[in-house]
Amino acid sequence: MPEEGVDLTEKGKLLSSEELVRIAKIFVDEGVKKIRLTGGEPLVRPDVIDLVAKLKALEGLETVAITTNGIVLAKKLDALKNAGLDMINLSLDTLEEKKYAFITRRPMAGFHKVMNSINKAIGYGYTPLKINCVVMRGLNEDEVTNFVGWTKDKPIDVRFIEYMPFDGNRWNDKKMVSYQGSTD
């Protein structure tokens, strides 16, 4: 999250559930089998439960997935499961509360909400739960082995993602840890 925050897109500029389902149907009719709702943060949509249910009802669509920051996932998980959500990817860049607060610009309590969401999702059978971790120089590159250890005995698959070094319209690779650099 940028230090200055982000401007939210006006509601009128977002696709409605009906528009999303109409577009999804076109893709499914052309052979797409899996649709993933991503963001921003898809769980802030007030109609996300209805959207998941409508997507799940599309004939030929096998999988409805979501990528979330996990902050409100635990609160919405019952309804999402009942709507037919098949898979969850959760973004988590650190296993340390203070780093979490710094990286996300959220209170440390958010970290506990995310961990609660992870445990609840696993309890609901979303396994393997997929965790996306963006590795950033000077922030969390020292935690890669911690993530591996944390997931060793849990039904969690962690995927380490290279930081995309865009700074406005400029390329800024100061925080980037390349795949090659992480294996050296």
PLM regions with names:
Residues 1-4, 92-94, 162:
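Short, small-residue-rich loop/turn micro-motifs
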Residues 1-4, 32, 65, 178-184:
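Proteins with a high burden of low-complexity, intrinsically disordered sequence enriched in S/T/G/P/A and R
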Residues 4-8, 97, 165-168:
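A short, flexible beta-alpha/helix-coil linker loop
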Residues 14-36, 45-157:
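Radical SAM/AdoMet-radical enzyme domain recognition
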Residues 137-139, 159-184:
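Flexible glycine/acidic-rich beta-alpha junction loops that bind and position SAM and/or redox cofactors
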